[in-house]
């Protein structure tokens, strides 16, 4: 394409992982960066969430069978687990709370989670979702570079913006604050939002 330089690389969540790696691997290719709700290393919390996702898929009796939609219901369950971490108590309370005190089934939260599972099933295969979570678990910018992640962050000299979302449970602001402290030319910003990751 004849592109020699990228003015600004932008990535959120695992897209932020890619931007960080690119900044380290090709330091002269990118002038600036903006990374949102991301981290320099997959957290123990993130790995635990991904493990629950994979377990849901593995518990689907069709998983690893030689059929087109093997593990599909397990992946839907995995997505439902994910939505507990991508959102939070307050946002569920605001949007899925029941007004009918007599209701004992067909809850809004149930419907919402099932809808999200179905929606994901239209754009992801269970094997790709499973493998994606495995790859995310391996993210660590210090691997093969430094003993300490903060030393690897110091290698990134480009000007940058590191952004958090106040209610993010999956990749909380402490992750981005750590990066902003150790990235030499980074500014930090916090978005106050109830919508989580």
Predicted regions and their residues:
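Well-ordered mid-protein domain cores that form the structural environment of catalytic cofactors
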Residues: 1-3
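Conserved hydrolase catalytic core segment
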Residues: 5-46
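Alpha/beta-hydrolase-fold enzymes
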Residues: 29-31, 35-119
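Residue-level signal for short, function-critical loop segments
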Residues: 39, 166-168
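Active-site nucleophile elbow and catalytic-triad environment of alpha/beta-hydrolase enzymes
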Residues: 115-116, 131-152
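Conserved alpha/beta-hydrolase "acid-adjacent" motif
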Residues: 144, 169-175
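Short beta-strand/loop motif that positions the catalytic acidic residue
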Residues: 156, 162-164
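Catalytic histidine neighborhood in serine/cysteine hydrolases
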Residues: 173-196
């Amino acid at each position: 394409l004849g592109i020699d330089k990228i003015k600004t690389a932008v990535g959120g969540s695992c897209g932020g992982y890619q931007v960080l790696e690119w900044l380290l691997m090709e330091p002269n290719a990118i002038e600036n960066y903006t990374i949102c709700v991301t981290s320099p290393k997959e957290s123990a919390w993130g790995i635990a969430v991904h493990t629950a996702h994979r377990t849901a898929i593995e518990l689907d009796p069709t998983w690893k069978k030689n059929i087109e939609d093997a593990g599909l219901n397990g992946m839907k369950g995995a997505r439902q687990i994910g939505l507990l971490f991508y959102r939070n108590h307050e946002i569920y309370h605001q949007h899925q709370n029941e007004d009918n005190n007599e209701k004992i089934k067909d809850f809004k939260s149930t419907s919402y989670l099932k809808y999200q599972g179905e929606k994901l099933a239209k754009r992801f295969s269970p094997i790709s979702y499973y493998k994606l979570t495995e790859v995310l678990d391996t993210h660590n910018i210090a691997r093969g570079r430094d003993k300490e992640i903060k030393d690897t962050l110091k290698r990134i000299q480009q000007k940058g913006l590191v952004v958090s979302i106040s209610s993010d449970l999956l990749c909380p602001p402490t992750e981005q604050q750590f990066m902003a402290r150790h990235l030499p030319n980074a500014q930090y910003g916090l978005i106050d939002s109830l919508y989580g990751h």
